[in-house]
Amino acid sequence: MAGRLREERKYRQKNRGLVQERIRLSLVVWESRKQGTSGQAKNFITRTQAVRKLQISLPDFRRLCIFKGIYPREPRNKKKASKAATPSTTFYYTRDIQYLLHEPLLKKFREQKALSKKIARALGRGEVGNAARLEKNNAPKLSLDHIIKERYPTFIDALRDLDDALSLLFLFANLPSTTSVPAKTITLCQRLCHEFQHYLIATNSLRKSFLSIKGIYYQATILGQDIMWLVPYRFVQRVTGDVDYRIMGTFVEFYTTLLGFVNYKLYTSIGLVYPPKFDKSSDERGAELAAFTLEGRYFGEAHKAIETSRQPNGSAEKAATTSKELQAKVDNILEKTQLDTDPTDQSTEDQEENIEAIDKFEPIAPEADSLPQPQISGDEAGSLFATFTFYISREAPRAPLEFLLRSFGCKRIGWDSVLGDGAFTHDELDARITHQIVDRPQLPQASLPPLPKNPEDGTEAAPRPGTRVPGRTYIQPQWVWDCINEGKLLRPDLYAPGATLPPHLSPWVKPSERGYDPRASLADQEEEGEAERAAEAEEYENDEQEESGEESTKSKQSKELLANLARDSGDENTSGDESVNGGMDIAMAEDTDESSDDGDGADKFEGFDQDEDMSSESEDEEEKARSQHQKELEAEAAGLPFSASSQAESGTIRGKKQQAPLAKKRAAQKKKEEEELERQKMMMSRKKRKLLDKMIYSNKKQDAEAEKLRQKRRKIEQGLNKK
């Protein structure tokens, strides 16, 4: 037994020595390990270190990061990640920079750097022609096709990232050409944007649009993906120097490649040839969308999405007459052959068309859940304006209106020849026009200058502004946007020229339960007693204004009275002085006597307060008598006896007295509800109580904002009613 214990003791001592040796070795390894080889120092790299590692310049590094979609990161501890005493400001993931080492564009950047050195050397030797030849023939061309495939493995991924691309390209399409924004880039952006718009027109994919301060928002649905972009208004844009157009130009270079891929895929998916035919001469005349001609890949005839009349006025009239003759011949042939259509076939076709319509589910009970309703379908969008012929006046924005009308089925749109080529008709008096979009105020005909007349018949060459053609509907541009957002045709009389337009609301912001709804009336969304409180507050403000007005008039009258008294007393003194001693001053002895008498009287005077009280009471009685006399005069002028006017005043006072207990009752009820809520909160846990407090705070804030908006609307409506 003793020997066994000795062996166990030796074994423990041996193991203890091994454990101590392991601890010593681990400490040595920990001390010898370098800092910055693990943790945040290993995961992050600064921008300077990344540029040195890739061996490119800083502008090329920025371009490469934009192309590859790599952006700076924010570490938790900048001091640990920077590996230096002073923390850096810009960090990247080390893995991202390691990923960039294998990018083929690095070779192109290095070739560009070598070429720039050769060009600088040639210019230094004075060989300008050699430098131009090097720049023209040896400039490396960047291809971003492989980057598009890497960043967007599927076409749906590309559609999801199309919002920013469209917004930036539409922005550059409306910029003026400068040294920082060349005309070649602007032309490319315009062409790609028009091609994308043509796809939306051909497929009726546009769903919503909204006019805002920033520009015009559009929303389209392509393959189930909602795409929203912003188009600026066509004002004269001023290019400022505080914007770095080199970085924006890099984004434009990437987004043009992306949109080119997307347009090709979209066109081929519906059987159209990409790129579509482009008429440069027509585009120079301002045709824009009409300069493109879509062609089918599997059909012999061209797909005409836009109807234009490119003939001169005389040829257009000849074409109209020939078309009428052809139609008459076709009608005669049909009458001779007696082709009858079966009504059953027509009914079945109508049923098949109705099958594709989207059903709307409306809740039966008010307490039932409301399902999100489906949006307008492509067929309904394509037939919204299909039966109309529009004419856009010169003052209306032609480009957005043309795009919207064509996207929702309109094939015949005319405008003035000043706005450009590509219109269905340039004649404002064309009998085929059903709707005219006008955005100018109503002016009297006498204030307009005379128009030039035709030398042949003496008639005016063009209709005068403000003239109305019988049988034509005149609307303002907002009617088009509101009809599209509502998915149906609205009343045109609400949008007549000169009429006060209804509010233009965002189609993507739905009114909440506790929020303010500008479409609903005030009576439907006011809280209990809110109108009475507003009336009381308004009466109180009016009373204060009347009191302040009366006080100001009284002060003015008193000042005028004092001025008149002073003037009269001054006139009397001057006349008295002139009558005594030929205008000489009176001896000062009397003044001294009077002053001494006044001084004695001041020493002996008592009871000033009683006299002052008596004078104030007499003034009050005089004021009451004067006010009563004034009221009698007002009642007599109104044709009422004084008793009736006094009864009306007593009625208003009685109404105010009756409203006071109502306000007290509401305050008591509100206090009771708050006490009940506090009593219920006592039974909750701390977590639920905090959540309830947050909900109550947000609801109160929302209610206050809604009440403020309702109060503003109430004042506007009262002002309109007074007018």
UniProtKB/Swiss-Prot annotation:
This is Pescadillo homolog. Keywords: Coiled coil, Nucleus, Ribosome biogenesis, rRNA processing. The gene is NOP7. Its main location: nucleus. Belongs to the pescadillo family. Residues 537-550, 588-600, 608-622 have a biased composition (Acidic residues). Residues 623-634, 670-681, 700-709 have a biased composition (Basic and acidic residues). Residues 380-497 form the BRCT domain. Residues 710-723 have a biased composition (Basic residues). Component of the NOP7 complex, composed of ERB1, NOP7 and YTM1. The complex is held together by ERB1, which interacts with NOP7 via its N-terminal domain and with YTM1 via a high-affinity interaction between the seven-bladed beta-propeller domains of the 2 proteins. The NOP7 complex associates with the 66S pre-ribosome. It holds the Pfam family Pescadillo_N.
